[in-house]
Each structure stands twice: as structure tokens, then as C-alpha cells.
Amino acid sequence: MSTSASGPEHEFVSKFLTLATLTEPKLPKSYTKPLKDVTNLGVPLPTLKYKYKQNRAKKLKLHQDQQGQDNAAVHLTLKKIQAPKFSIEHDFSPSDTILQIKQHLISEEKASHISEIKLLLKGKVLHDNLFLSDLKVTPANSTITVMIKPNPTISKEPEAEKSTNSPAPAPPQELTVPWDDIEALLKNNFENDQAAVRQVMERLQKGWSLAK
């Protein structure tokens, strides 16, 4: 099969190359458009809906290695040497992580949150994503030291409300306005001008009723 360009194709390529060499490029090869001038980010691509499980392959291998083995469990002693002290023995799977040990301690009500727990083996802090199979636990080093420090940033349970038996505050007493005394004072000031006294009294009584 011939790969040579036909007449029209050869003519197009020839003219294109000729035009491309007539003028120098206005922009250098290293030119990049400033971000402030970018108005279009191109065609949006759909989100890839896939959750990559980083530890899946390793867990699968551990599961295959455990098949046919009766004594695959990892026996651990979780010991807290600070008050209040405790010691818990439990069988875990080699594919379990340090995070799952912390969750077990929470289920045993030894802590309220994972952030409060720190596990150590031979003085080294164990990270949450570490597999028990990586610890190479033997009967001689099967004790994990537990340190629990309450986290002050975790909100505590709300305090109990005050006893309802405490006496309720007495309702405010309604004030009694001495209208007669006020009227007598007005008569004295207005020299018994009944029209002026009546007008002022009406305004005072109306304002008092609106202020209630």
C-alpha cells in the first residue's frame, strides 16, 4: 500500500508549510498564559467513581496464607500501666491493624475516642495503618503498652440540668398607680383647672396602658 500523499493532500501540506515559515511565531515556546486571563478550563471530565483500596492486595494475600492454618490468630495482651490500670487479652487476626486494636479498646469502654489512645511495643509508637503481621509478634513480645490521655477538644456529655425541685421565681407583682394622688398634685399645679387636669390624666393613663 502506497503511503505517498495524493495530489490535493500534497498541495495542502506544501502550502501549509510555506505559510508557517513566512512569519515568526509571536509567542515563545515557553509561553504560559497567566491564570488571571484564563476564562475557560476546557471540557470538564466526569469524576472517576472508583475507591482504591490500598491494603486490599495485602489483606488478600494474608487471607490466602491463613487458609488451612488453625493457629493463625495473634494473641495479644493490652496492658495499661498508668492508673487506672488494666490488662486485656484478646486474639486478633494477622490482617488486623493497630486501628482495629484501638477500636477494640473503645468497645471495652477503656476510652471514648481513637485520638485518646496510643499503643507502644518495646517503646515504639505503633501507627494506625500498621498490620499485626508486620509486628512479628512472639510469646516473648506479645504485650502492647496502652496509653490513654483524654482529649480536651472532644465535647463532653452535657451536664445534668438543675433539680426541678428548686423554687420557681415568683411572678412579678402588678404595680398599682396612685392615680388619685397624681390627680391631686395636678390640681395643685394647675390651680384647679379641671380641663387641663383631665387632659393630662387621660394622657398619663393612656400611656400607662400602652406600656404594659
Swiss-Prot record:
It is found in: Cytoplasm, Cytosol; Nucleus. Gene3D superfamilies: Get5 dimerization domain (1.10.286.70), Phosphatidylinositol 3-kinase Catalytic Subunit, Chain A, domain 1 (3.10.20.90), Single helix bin (1.20.5.510). It holds the Pfam family Get5_bdg. Residues 150-177 are annotated as: Disordered. GO terms for biological process: cell morphogenesis involved in conjugation with cellular fusion; post-translational protein targeting to endoplasmic reticulum membrane; protein insertion into ER membrane. Residues 74-152 form the Ubiquitin-like domain. Keywords: Cytoplasm, Nucleus. It comes from the Eukaryota. SUPFAM superfamilies: Ubiquitin-like (SSF54236). One of its GO terms (cellular component) is cytosol. InterPro entries: MDY2_C (IPR040474), Mdy2_get4-bd (IPR031765), Ubiquitin-like_dom (IPR000626), Ubiquitin-like_domsf (IPR029071), UBL4A-like (IPR047154). GO terms for molecular function: protein-macromolecule adaptor activity. Present with 6510 molecules/cell in log phase SD medium. Interacts with GET4. This is Ubiquitin-like protein MDY2. It comes from Saccharomyces cerevisiae (strain ATCC 204508 / S288c) (Baker's yeast). The gene is MDY2.
